[in-house]
Every structure is written in structure tokens, then in C-alpha cells.
Amino acid sequence: MGDSPKCLRDSLREALRRREDKLCRRKLTILPSSSVDFSSNDFLSLSTSPAYRARFLDILQQAPPLHPFASGGSRLLDGNSAYAEELENFIAAFHNAPSGLLFNSGYDANVGVFSSIPQPGDLIVYDELIHASAHEGMRLSRAGKRIKFPHSSPDGLRAVLQAEITADPRLLQGRRNVFIAFESVYSMDGDVAPIREFVEIVDQLLPYGNGYFLVDEAHATGVFGPRGSGVVQELGLEDRMFVRVHTFGKALASHGAIVLCCADTRDYLINYARSLIYTTALGFPFLASIRAAYELLVEGKTEQLQHKLGQLIAHFRTGLDNLNHKDSSTFEVEHFTNSPIFSLRSSVPRVLASVCQEQGYTVRAIMPPTVPAGKERVRVCLHAGNTVEEVDGLLETIATWLQRMEKQKARL
């Protein structure tokens, strides 16, 4: 008799044990409410904004009596509403887009776009650090080939495209579509993609206009660009992007996402994006919260928050630059100008994160598989609601930890 088969629970426990051994097992945690937030994506601090809350409640109160809070079904069945379509038009107008289509999350939006739009034989070229949701969508895609290029590298994109064009002349002839996918702002290092350079390269190598850009603006929404409209609008490149995805769960303190695109693409997604078709649509409270956030953006009511956030970013960056540390393996800062996201690289990120948390500052150690091995870091996110005193307190905590680490190394 052979060995009896493992039960499912044994297999699950073994998988978790392997992650535990690699120090990369994920767990849900709850930190004290008194902790200072330097971790969340609530960049504008709208989630605690009295102005945002008042606008949201006002929209709810304006609804007719007995207006249903739940959508009741998929957008294609009973879940659609005039309010949802008006909201899509309102957001699309703000972003200078022909039309938009709401999804329940940025994850659903990316899965819907990547899984349905590329056609058989098409090529997807994507930044190696693109969101996991894009990878999920690509796995479901009918595209003939998917190939990554080095992170935010114009030369890397050029090399990949040139190699593919050489291998398949139909690309140069405009007989096959090429989708170029990237994020405008990346979540781990906060760096901004060289979008203008990408456009120039695609124009040079694909002169028949068969290169289509798919850009995820999740971490740019509300923070970058005029009135928080995003990096693409800051560059004036709206017309060059085939699809833009803006999400509402970060700086806008709500939930969901919108795919900005032309009317034909919107209609195609309604017919083919399974992550839209086979899920219950957003209910009225979610739509109202999205509307409240965008009304504040449109009216310029968040520009002061953007300005304050920018001041805190500059202050924190200066403080980090002034830290007296000698060993880059212990501590190294990666930061892109004007980004609220800071990457504090360390060989012991869990130790640094724990020290900060003990002092009342919420930061997170980011470990593999979320980031590649050797790229571990403590991720710090600044918010408009943070104070200079809180930022200085975090800097002091980091400085004290660095001094202790250097003394320990000196004894060795």
C-alpha cells in the first residue's frame, strides 16, 4: 500500500509553513487607533476630512425618499442607474476623456481591460513592476504574446519593441496591435514613469498607429496633476492613452475605479469584460462617496491639501538627507521628487518597522514576494493630514535607530 493521500488541510499548512520559514508569511494586523498613519494610501487625508464627510452626507440626503442603497444586481441587469451613468460622464469630463466605465475596484478594472481588449495575435509589452491585477488580466488574455521590459526604462522598451518588430514584420506594417502597459506612479518606490519618452519611442517604431497605451493612475489620482487629475493630464497626453484607469480607494477615500476610454472601447468592455458583467454593481452610497470626492477635485477644494502634502514631502526628504548614516546596506533612501511614497531600503526592514511602531508611527515592512528578494524596504507614505511635528518624530525615531545600529556594528 502506498502512502495515504495528504488531506487538504495538511497541504495548506505545509504551504504556510514554507512561507513562515522564508519569513514572508502574510498576516492581518490591527494597530492602535492612536498610531500616526505613515502607511495608508489616504494621501489627501480625505477619509477623515470634515469637508468630504459633509459633502458625502449632503449627497445622501438629497436622494429621494426610499432611494435604494443597494444596486440590486449587475450593471447589465438591474444594477445600472442614471446616477451611475451621470457620474461616469462627470468623471470623464474632469479627466478630458471621451467616456468612462465604472468598475468595483482597480483590480477588477485591470482584469477587465487586460483580459478582454487584446485580440488573438496581439502583443502586450508591460513594465516588469506593473500591478498584480494586470498580470491576472494578462493570464486570461487572448493576446498572442506578453513580454516585460525593464522598469521605467525607455531604452528597455525600445529594445523589446525592436526585437519583436524584427521577429514579426506585421508589427511594423500595422497588421498587429501592440499594447504598452505601465503605471504612472508606482506603489512601492513612488517613482513616476517616463511617459513622454514612451510615447516618442512608440511613435518612432510603430508609425502606423498600432501602439496602444494602457496606463494605471491609481497612485496618481488626487495627488499629481492639476487638481489631482493625474500624471497624464499634467503632461497633456490624454489623447495618446488608449485606456486610463483611475481608482477611488486611495487618495479619494472611497471605493471602485473608472476606465477612461473612447465610446467604442466602453461598449466593448460592457459586452466582454467579465469582471464587470458577472458582479453586482456599486451601490448608491459608494457612488455618492465617489461623487463627493470628485466634486471637491473639480471645485479645487483639494488643491490646498495637495500643497500641504508637497510641503511635508519636501520637509521629510530634507530630514532624511540630513541623517548621518554611513552604511547603505543598513539604510538607504529611494524617493522620487514630489511623490508622497518613500522607500527606506534596509537589510532589516522588520526591525526598523517594529521600532517605529513601538514609538506610535504606523509604517510597514515590505517583504518578498510583494517585492523581489534583495529589495526589502520600509514603505513610508505621507498624508496631507500629517503634521510637521509627526514627521519630525518619525525622523527622530529613524535617526535613533540608525545610531544604535551603527554602534552595534562598530562593536563587531
UniProtKB/Swiss-Prot annotation:
Biological process, per Gene Ontology: biotin biosynthetic process
Question: What is the E.C. number?
Answer: 2.3.1.47
Spell out the molecular function terms from Gene Ontology. 8-amino-7-oxononanoate synthase activity; pyridoxal phosphate binding
Q: What does this protein do?
A: 8-amino-7-oxononanoate synthase; part of the cluster involved in the biosynthesis of biotin (also known as vitamin B8 or vitamin H), a water-soluble vitamin that functions as a prosthetic group of many carboxylases, such as acetyl-CoA carboxylase and pyruvate carboxylase. Catalyzes the decarboxylative condensation of pimeloyl-[acyl-carrier protein] and L-alanine to produce 8-amino-7-oxononanoate (AON).
Describe its assembly: Homodimer.
Carrying N6-(pyridoxal phosphate)lysine, the residues are 250
- Pathway the protein acts in: Cofactor biosynthesis; biotin biosynthesis
Q: What does its record list under induction?
A: Expression is increased when transferring biotin auxotrophic mutant mycelia from biotin-supplemented medium to biotin-deficient medium.
Cofactors: pyridoxal 5'-phosphate
Q: Which UniProt keywords apply?
A: Biotin biosynthesis, Pyridoxal phosphate, Transferase
Q: What is this protein called?
A: 8-amino-7-oxononanoate synthase
Instruction: Specify one Pfam family.
Output: Aminotran_1_2
Q: What is the lineage of its organism?
A: Eukaryota, Fungi, Dikarya, Ascomycota, Pezizomycotina
GO terms under cellular component: peroxisome
Entry keyword Transferase: yes
Q: Where does substrate bind?
A: 131, 370
Chemical reaction(s) catalysed: 6-carboxyhexanoyl-[ACP] + L-alanine + H(+) = (8S)-8-amino-7-oxononanoate + holo-[ACP] + CO2
Superkingdom, natural source: Eukaryota
Q: Into which EC class is this enzyme placed?
A: transferase
Species this protein is from? Emericella nidulans (strain FGSC A4 / ATCC 38163 / CBS 112.46 / NRRL 194 / M139)
Q: Which InterPro entries match?
A: Aminotransferase_I/II_large, AON_synthase_class-II, PyrdxlP-dep_Trfase, PyrdxlP-dep_Trfase_major, PyrdxlP-dep_Trfase_small
Which residues does pyridoxal 5'-phosphate bind? Answer: 106-107, 187, 219, 247
Q: Which family does it belong to?
A: Belongs to the class-II pyridoxal-phosphate-dependent aminotransferase family. BioF subfamily.
